[in-house]
Amino acid sequence: MDVLYSLSKTLKDARDKIVEGTLYSNVSDLIQQFNQMIITMNGNEFQTGGIGNLPIRNWNFNFGLLGTTLLNLDANYVETARNTIDYFVDFVDNVCMDEMVRESQRNGIAPQSDSLRKLSAIKFKRINFDNSSEYIENWNLQNRRQRTGFTFHKPNIFPYSASFTLNRSQPAHDNLMGTMWLNAGSEIQVAGFDYSCAINAPANIQQFEHIVPLRRVLTTATITLLPDAERFSFPRVINSADGATTWFFNPVILRPNNVEVEFLLNGQIINTYQARFGTIVARNFDTIRLSFQLMRPPNMTPAVAVLFPNAQPFEHHATVGLTLRIESAVCESVLADASETLLANVTSVRQEYAIPVGPVFPPGMNWTDLITNYSPSREDNLQRVFTVASIRSMLIK
């Protein structure tokens, strides 16, 4: 894997810097590195593809070295270099695709394609070994079963979940009380509602709670907490739990009271925040517990009192909500996030070449399915294919 990264890094630098008019002295070190790559690869044969519709391709390396010059690189020099670069880039691209479409239930962190296994031979270590990539560094750690650490921006840690619970209901669905939520990606939005605006609740206060377990532990997380849930701020028609009917939700938004967010690890509270909004942080956690209250306004102008009458019919429904968004965090496991296109890269290649469903990943690389059942086998395979996708993205956009 590190050899593949070193190949890709060398080729990227060569493609960017070996251009007509450049002083040879400015790229002499790169050209020496490039020649070392050619020397190491010459005389070797590889085969890629042969799974799904990914075609079989044979690769033979027999290239001349780039020479030295006292002056600028001319058009002939650059054209010779470009022909070699293009062949190598095509080779790396096909090795990456061949690796990204394969999976294994056992030791899925190790190379699965014949071409990448061959590149793991000791003789290829002479290709300017480079371990500067976060993905390569963590792949080496995971391969030795040592602790890894990935930094993510808006990590997709929450499987998609959109539903509701009713703490008070009737067949007519005309005086409901409960919670509804939408968890997806890096964001939780939860709303508590009471059609009667807590008229019969103790002290005219309704208490709500929303608990979200994570599939992996997050550490050093920067989080945004807001006293609102905008996705539940407009009228909608909702299917009943049994699917027999529908009910109308017409929210009027109030500010939540006594808001508390707890971050827990193995059932123990690690961080707690009360009535604090904006940016907060959490050290390490595997569960988030949100609690908040809906309080009936003790004093109301006539216009507000019309919205919240003391008896039915309740045409407007008092609602309070919270939004929690994980902006950045560290995780030992690889995740899809907002700053990378690795999941899309892997998925698009598997779709383009009609790769059959294997023993590890769900059909279509469905992320909700994958993260909901994030087994050690899936974790190993996903880290490997994401590492390869990160290497491919250096050359192929």
Swiss-Prot record:
Ca(2+) binds at residues 266, 286. Changing residue 121 to G: In strain: Isolate temperature-sensitive mutant G. Residues 62-73 are annotated as: Interaction with the inner capsid protein VP2. It is found in: Virion. Keywords: Calcium, Capsid protein, Intermediate capsid protein, Metal-binding, Ubl conjugation, Virion, Zinc. One of its GO terms (biological process) is fusion of virus membrane with host plasma membrane. The N-terminus is blocked. Sumoylated with SUMO1 and SUMO2. Sumoylation of viral proteins seems to have a positive role on viral replication. One of its GO terms (cellular component) is viral intermediate capsid. Intermediate capsid protein that self assembles to form an icosahedral capsid with a T=13 symmetry, which consists of 230 trimers of VP6, with channels at each of its five-fold vertices. This capsid constitutes the middle concentric layer of the viral mature particle. The innermost VP2 capsid and the intermediate VP6 capsid remain intact following cell entry to protect the dsRNA from degradation and to prevent unfavorable antiviral responses in the host cell during all the replication cycle of the virus. This is Intermediate capsid protein VP6.
